[in-house]
Amino acid sequence: MTGNEAAAEAAIQAGCRFYYGYPITPQNEIINHMAMRMPQVGGTFIQAESEIAAINMLHGSAAAGARVMTSSSGPGISLKQEGISYLAGSELPCVIVNVQRGGPGLGDISPSQADYFQAVKGGGHGDYRMIVLAPSSVQEIADLVYDAFDLADKYRNPVMILGDAQLGQMMEPVEFYKPAKTYLPPKKWALTGADGRPKNVIKSFYPVKGELEKFNRRLQKKYRKIEETEVRYEEINTKDADLVLVAYGTCARISREVMNKASKIGYRIGLLRPITLWPFPKDALRRLSQRVRTFMVVEMSAGQMVEDVKLSILGRCPVHFYGRMGGGVPSTNEIINNILEVLPKINAADSVEMIEI
């Protein structure tokens, strides 16, 4: 199935029974799958009148204790930013899938990774964070969407799946090996209308002096706990590497092939693939920076994650960047030729020509 279909089905398997969305390419397969499957499992599917309406519908169902999801791409995610801030400010769990497309503006429907800043730094107002998960295969889309609902409930926080058009549209085998969740424990904080307990209040408005600062301090404490316990990454062939590629999503798939090809021409290349973009694997990068000669960050953007890599390694070694913008996807040859420009060939002549592999 496609990556988009895998995201939708994994959400259903994870117990999501409320989906609200609005059509936009390249994520429409998510909406189509939800429209078909939600009635079959007794869930609710609504194609909202707008992206803004969809994110606020999410707010209501999440407050009632349901597992909820929306999805969009590029301009649609931008429209949701105020609502995402409200969800974070109300500490409401939800899952948001962003199938990135080229920008800025209307852009195009090609794959991109230019929404990184918006996702990991917080595109809406206020000091809030989302957990951001970055799959690099259709199977991993399914796995991470399933996990995203557990993380959202665990921390009462929005979780974003940051994909791209290529991952969303590609087809690969998928196994839903985790048990479908047919029962979810009640959420003590939810607005259920139950009698016999203190009333629950869900809000993000704190007009009394000092209340908002106290709330923000509690949020930051929660975020620190997430940073301490939820970092995920994959590290490949870094033990003896002279250069380590850092890439996520589609670019990580390409970088893995670059690593394999480069080894055949005498280069010791490793790969660090962040799976959580927030919290970012800064400690892993910091450790690597003590023993590798240089890093190269590969992105489908003008360079966004590269800033977090530089902040992580504290100037211990050079950080190079290669990126394609506006829907461009880096090729293995392009990346290898950039490696040849920045790193002398191992066990061979220092001067090498550009090559085609």
PLM regions and their residue ranges:
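N-terminal alpha/beta PP-like core and its mobile active-site loop of ThDP/TPP-dependent enzymes
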Residues: 60-69, 75-135, 184
